[in-house]
Curated annotation (Swiss-Prot):
Principal location: cytoplasm
Localisation per UniProt entry: Cytoplasm
Designated gene of the protein: glyQ
KW Electron transport (keyword) present: no
One of the protein's GO biological processes: glycyl-tRNA aminoacylation
Domain of life: Bacteria
HAMAP family linked to this entry: Gly_tRNA_synth_alpha (MF_00254)
Source organism (scientific name): Streptococcus pneumoniae (strain CGSP14)
CC terms in the record's Gene Ontology section: cytosol
CDD domains: GlyRS_alpha_core
Catalytic activity: tRNA(Gly) + glycine + ATP = glycyl-tRNA(Gly) + AMP + diphosphate
Protein name: Glycine--tRNA ligase alpha subunit
């Protein structure tokens, strides 16, 4: 019987595969976020006309999902392997199935289903056509073709493939609890993450200072606006991410009512939309440097008319 891939070998295998498909291997972005989609390597690069192909691991924090390390599948923080390709290759689904084969999962021997599940992120004004990918009855991946990001229509279309690494590793290693996943030879997932899971859950549900978080949200929102007034897209987006994580902490703590919740989401969305518009304008001002010469000249000429 062949040795099962460790968690880090799964990551390395996916990195090698998508590198061979022309993706840049980016590193995780250093701000808290609820999903890999919120990284600027996806959110910002999915808009505008320039091509973009990237793959990266993104630790994703969802305070309300914390379970003190007691639930085998529900986590405060999990890991996503994110692939974004713009324009979307026509064979992206075939490439995805090929990536599973590299992980030792033969599509001909397993029940792999693409289940329609259109995607929406209200807090960033983003949406797209999507599918969940189910492997023998368990969701392991989300497929999305972005239609709108930051309130802007996308073009060319960006394809996003988001692997749930813990679920994928649980399946490959045949374990029932994420904490039993072998991260590296001789080191289990739980030995690294179960204590942080407990502590972050306790903080999110019991200890966090609600007044401080409320004040921080207002301060982060204001600072994002100040950065945008100066045309500073990336610092502004950092503060949008801080607003989002602060809201998630408030939500986990039960500190916002249903009505207030909608208001906070709208405030984050409004900032994200301004960031998106400012980013597109910035790339145009820079002359769309990632476009080939012919396409760039044509597009800039059209914009000048």
């Amino acid at each position: 019987m062949s040795k099962k891939l460790t968690f880090q070998e799964i990551i390395l295998t996916l990195q090698r595969f998508w590198n061979d498909q022309g993706c840049m291997l980016m590193q995780a972005y250093d701000n808290e976020k609820g999903a890999g989609t919120m990284s600027p390597y996806t959110f910002l690069r999915a808009i505008g006309p320039e091509p973009w192909n990237a793959a990266y691991v993104e630790p994703s924090r969802r305070p309300a999902d914390g379970r003190y390390g007691e639930n085998p599948n529900r986590l405060y923080q999990h890991h996503q392997f994110q692939v974004v390709m713009k324009p979307s290759p026509s064979n992206i689904q075939e490439l995805y199935l090929e990536s599973l084969e590299k992980l030792g999962i033969n599509p001909l021997e397993h029940d792999i289903r693409f289940v329609e599940d259109n995607w929406e992120n209200p807090s960033t004004g983003s949406a797209g056509l999507g599918w969940e990918v189910w492997l023998d009855g368990m969701e392991i991946t989300q497929f999305t073709y972005f239609q709108q990001v930051g309130g802007l229509a996308t073009g060319p279309v960006t394809a996003e493939v988001t692997y749930g690494l813990e679920r994928l590793a649980s399946y490959i290693q045949e374990v029932d609890s994420v904490y039993d996943i072998e991260w590296a030879d001789g080191v289990k997932y739980g030995e690294i993450f179960i204590q942080p899971e407990y502590e972050h859950s306790k903080y999110s549900f019991e200890i966090s200072d609600q007044e401080m978080l409320l004040e921080n949200f207002d301060k982060f929102e204001k600072e994002a606006g100040r950065a945008l007034e100066e045309g500073l897209v990336h610092p502004a987006y950092d503060y949008v991410l801080k607003c989002s994580h602060t809201f998630n902490l408030l939500d986990a703590r039960g500190a916002v009512s249903v009505t207030e919740r909608a208001g906070y989401i709208a405030r984050i969305r409004n900032l994200a939309r301004v960031v998106a518009k400012t980013f597109v304008a910035e790339r145009k001002r820079l002359g769309y440097p990632l476009l080939d010469e012919e396409t760039r000249a044509k597009l800039l000429a059209e914009d000048a008319e």
